[in-house]
Amino acid sequence: MKKPNLFVWLILAGLIKIYTFFLGLKIVKKVNIKGPAIVLGNHNAFMDYMFSTSALYPRRVTYLAAAKMFKEPHRRPFLKLGRAIPKTMFESDLGAIKSTFEILKQQGIVCIYPEGQVSYHGTSLPSPYAIAKLLKKANVPVYVCLIKNAYLFSPPWSKRKFKGRVQVELSQLFDRESLSQLEEAQIYEKVSKAIYFNTGAFNREEKWSYRVQPIQGLEPLLYQCPECLHEGLQAKQNTLACPACQHTLVYDAYGFLNGKSVYEWFQRQQSRLIETIEKTEDYQLSIPVRLVRYVGKGLGEVGQGIFSVTKDKYVYQGTDKGSTKRYEFLTKVVEYLPVDIGKNVQMYYDHEIYIFEMNDPIMTTKMFITGEYYYQLSKTKS
């Protein structure tokens, strides 16, 4: 594994830096980063890699990226040019670890988003504990690239840009000496605290404003009316409206809907679903899906069937490449269920991917809330 080509990096990363400059990116450098080093970032938007690349320029950075992204035609060429390291999500990947250490031995800089996926509601997600083990073993200086309000500028539920301010702050979290003295649990706690960012709480204080755009794409995430509890809010311009009682949430220039952040509304909705799960004996969800897996160098639909979640397991019953299959995944071992809001949920097992595409956008949100709750429930009983 080699660091990114210097010539290619200076050109491509330079173009990214110019692009983000005109977008209004502000960079606050509290440190000068030199390799070998690991940079950790919070992950609230798909554009985060652009913001961190700009902040670290002209330093060459090697990114750890989800292995499935290397199978996506619109992303693969850029990942290859940048010599990114493919990483299987939410399971041990010895190949990715080996490549990471090879870059560090070359005095390189490796950038990791420990959350493993973009935060769909604008507040940092819990990071897998494995990040603490990696940092402890690597024993190189660790820095934080904290990206503020990228969620409001480029929300993951929209293809639109909500023009406004994004700020990146670079700071040091650990040096070699502190890493050698800390236990893994202490490292994990400090990492979690350092990369935590709550968009709503931050902007309630700072009041950075953004150009309001239509918010189509938010309704699969915030699907329930807070007044009558009807499921199926409808997005129109910058509003979410309930077709049953006409209650309307208005998205404003500060990223709030009727004074509350997306995360606050999501938490309320999540709590109501969990309450329903707890009150319903043998609560489960089932939905028709299209199964997508690795096919050659890409991703392709390989079958159709029913995907369900119960207290004990996820089950896919259907076809896969012409054969009838039944795949089971225990909820007690699936801590995180990655989701593309409104599109699919994903399962990673033995370096394979199972993408369950759904026609009902709301079910993607209900499925991951239910599955991850059952995981937490299994831990309290063990």
Model region roles, listed by residue range:
Residues 4-5, 12, 18-189, 212, ...:
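Soluble catalytic domains of membrane acyltransferases
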Residues 39, 307-342:
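Phosphoinositide-dependent membrane-docking surfaces
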Residues 60, 239, 248, 306, ...:
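Structural motif
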Residues 174, 185-221:
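A conserved mid-domain beta-alpha-beta active-site/ligand-binding segment of alpha/beta enzyme cores
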Residues 212-260:
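Cys/His-rich short segments
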Residues 248-322:
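Long, charge-rich boundary regions
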Residues 297-300, 317-325, 351-358, 362:
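Short, surface-exposed beta-strand/loop "edge" segments at domain boundaries and coil↔beta transitions
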Residues 329-382:
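Acidic, Ser/Thr- and proline-rich intrinsically disordered linker/docking segments
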